[in-house]
Amino acid sequence: DKLKTAGQTLETLRKEYETKASRHQVLDEIDKNMAGFQSSLKSVIMADRQGRLSGIRGTVADIISVDKRYTVAIEIALGGIMQNIVTDNEEAAKRSMRYLKENNLGRATFLPLTSVKGKMLEVGGLSNENGFEGMACDLVEYDGLYDGIVKSILGKTAVVEDIDTASFIAKKYGYRFKIVTLDGQVINAGG
């Protein structure tokens, strides 16, 4: 009995380690790829605070909040999009791009509130599947002002309990949408 319990404990710890190691690897990769991007992001935010730019709302990471249970899944679903800059409109985005270019400060991706219009994928029966947690856009909190942006970036991503559930749902629904597990594993649309 003690041996069986020890074996189960070992298996649980092994799974926890694999999950954390996988998350660490993903975050490292994001960090490496974002090295140049981070400075441009900071430059835009600082220029906005100093009054040299206007119409900057912040990053995607700034406009959403996530329950602890879904943090890993949402971070993985968003990836580098977390660092995209939300602006009031296209003009604010263009001014920011010109500012970055004129000052050789790198590049950034902008999401103007007035032009990014997202819709949530509606798949009949999906909410009844065992292990289905919700569509990613429904698992984050945000001001209604950002509805179009949040649905654009998270409205076609389902969050599920585990990889077995993800595989089952992906096959059943023809790989039509991205699926992320609570521990950060991904099955992309199209397979």
Regions found by a protein language model. Name each.
Residues D1-G7, E11, E18, Q25:
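Residue-level encoding of the coiled-coil heptad register
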Residues Q8-T12, V86-N89:
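Conserved short loop/turn motifs at secondary-structure junctions
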Residues T19-G191:
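Hinge-like oligomerization/junction regions that interrupt long coiled-coil arms in large cytoskeletal
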